[in-house]
Structures are given as structure tokens and as C-alpha cells.
Amino acid sequence: MADLKITLIKSAAHRLPKQRAIVKSLGLGRVSSSVVKPNNEATRGAIFHIAHLVSVEEVK
């Protein structure tokens, strides 16, 4: 499986505490920050909860 590049496109401020915790646990800090994570069920589950805040693209 390829990795996923996750980019924070909207701020996590004024969001539910669970959503803020997920953003922080993924290693995203400021808007436009990006991380590369493995494409597994745990990562996809986290992305599902904050899909409206992030942009996801597949990286080989």
C-alpha cells in the first residue's frame, strides 16, 4: 500500500475536542502543515473524523 499525505486545510480551532485531538495525534499543527502516514485502517479512521478539515492524497 502507498502512503497518504495529509494536509490540514482548515483550522482545528473551535472544533470538537475529539477532532482537535485527532489533528494533534496525526502530527498536524498549523494550517497548510502536512504529514505522510501509512495507509492503514487506523489512519483512514482518523481521517474519516476530520475529513472536512484535511486534504488527502496518495504518495508512492
Swiss-Prot record:
Any one GO molecular function term: structural constituent of ribosome
GO cellular component: cytosolic large ribosomal subunit
A GO biological-process term: translation
Signal peptide: none
Keywords: Ribonucleoprotein, Ribosomal protein
PANTHER family hit by this protein: LARGE RIBOSOMAL SUBUNIT PROTEIN UL30M, MITOCHONDRIAL RIBOSOMAL PROTEIN L30
Record-stated family: Belongs to the universal ribosomal protein uL30 family.
Subunit structure: Part of the 50S ribosomal subunit.
Protein name: Large ribosomal subunit protein uL30
Natural source organism: Leuconostoc citreum (strain KM20)
Gene from which the chain derives: rpmD
